[in-house]
Amino acid sequence: MKKFLSILSTVVVLLLASCMGGTSKSGTGGAGGEVTGVSGSSMQEPSPYGMVLVKRGSLKMGTESTDSLWGKDLPTREISVDAFWMDEHEVTNSMYRQFVFWVRDSIIRERLADPAYGGDESYKIEEDKNGDPITPHLNWNKSIPWKNPDEDQQRAIESVYTIHPFTGERMLDASQMNYRYETFDYATAALRKYRLNPAERNLNTDVQVDPNEEVMISKDTAYVDDEGIIHRETLTRPLSSMWDFVNTYIINVYPDTTCWINDFQNAENEVYMRLYFSHANYNDFPVVGVNWEQANAFCNWRTNYLIRGLGASAKFIQRYRLPTEAEWEYAARGKEGNELPWTQEGVKSDKGCFYANFKPDRGNYTEDGSLITSKVGIFSANSNGLYDMAGNVAEWTSTIFTEAGVLSMSDMNPELYYNAAKEDPYALKKKSVRGGSWKDPESFIKSAWRSSEYQNVGRSFIGFRCVRSQVGTGAKAAKGAKSSGGKTRRQRH
């Protein structure tokens, strides 16, 4: 009898399962018991403002020629990169000033909510709509009273400005323009040796797992002391939770405007130091004096700024970041893979017009029409739709600089990222810089040319642009490849 009931219950379960199988495309069922997959939800990724899509492809990275200075063979390798969005031109003074002003306004809002400046609680949100406590954050929907502020509000606003002791000029206090942000280190968290579950750290079943093994991990943290000085520390401690993969940074984001003096001593460049970043006449010129750390901070801010603007629809939007060295060269070479971003030979047309802003001859900076930087986008774009990939300003990449270059990386989406700790030797803080600049000769503006700079140094000839990975798009199927169900199936060769 029990056996009969068991068989009967099994039949009932199978019947119910077959009834539930259906033809649902969004649930767990499949047509006729076949596994058809779960469609899930998708969204059409909007084209990012001011960016162009660089489609996936391959190239021979590097150059076959020899280093003309040292006579060394330069590293080359066949590599492939996935599709990504890239700024059509370098980040401009106007764009970067928006970042600096956002930092300024965030400081003012913090102080408007501070009891020492009147304590207007409406500038900081600490409860949700139901009155439950939440992580405090600034209220950006409430305007700063720039016009007709009361006494406390005026003190809060003026607190971010300073007066030049000689000229009496009211200036933004650059030393206060600190941006704090956090990042989650997905790459480190994915490594087996850092798994929180000890059993997942080694898949070799012949190896005895020690459940009490102590795994040490390093993470970056930062704070500002009472004197306003930023202190960065790299902590090494036992791995205990996912929070150990969160790094905290505080970066002073104001560009080093003194780079115009320090880069070119015994030159009359004071006007650039005082006005290049702040004057409206330079709005559309590439921002300079921004170091690698500041460029990364800009990318983080730009990501969060977009997410706040898009709201819930930003769930699958990829973060803004600096391009890898491989992405930069691939994008610069254009669809033809040229040595220079343009298709023609040489650096100027038959009419004598230059294709880029660089140093055409010894002591001659102006033959191409500019003495220093030029407005972005005044020269023709390459076949990828990108401007100024040669000359104007050299550009930061995310990649650490090594002599081996691409030879020390994977041949798929190659990257060599190293987050140097404060205690690391200074030599480990070099990052790869690409593209050449307004001060460089022709040989230095070629797409494969590599140079370097320390990550905490801003130069008058180095800027940057951002990229964003494209959310997965498949390759086009080969013509005539059909499955029995009539759906196109990709052929592999």
What are these regions (language model features)?
Residues K3-T10:
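Sec-dependent signal peptide recognition
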Residues L16-S18:
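C-terminal motif of bacterial Sec signal peptides marking the signal peptidase cleavage site
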Residues T23-A31, L53-V54, K60, S65, ...:
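Functional-site microenvironments in short loops/helix caps that host divalent-cation chemistry
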Residues G27-R56:
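Post-signal peptide N-terminal segment of mature Sec-exported envelope proteins
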Residues F84, V91, V100-R111, W301-G309:
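Short capping motifs at secondary-structure boundaries
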Residues A420-P425, S451-G458:
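Short proline/glycine-enriched turn/loop segments at secondary-structure junctions
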Residues S460-G474:
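Short, structured beta-strand segments at or near domain termini in extracellular proteins/domains
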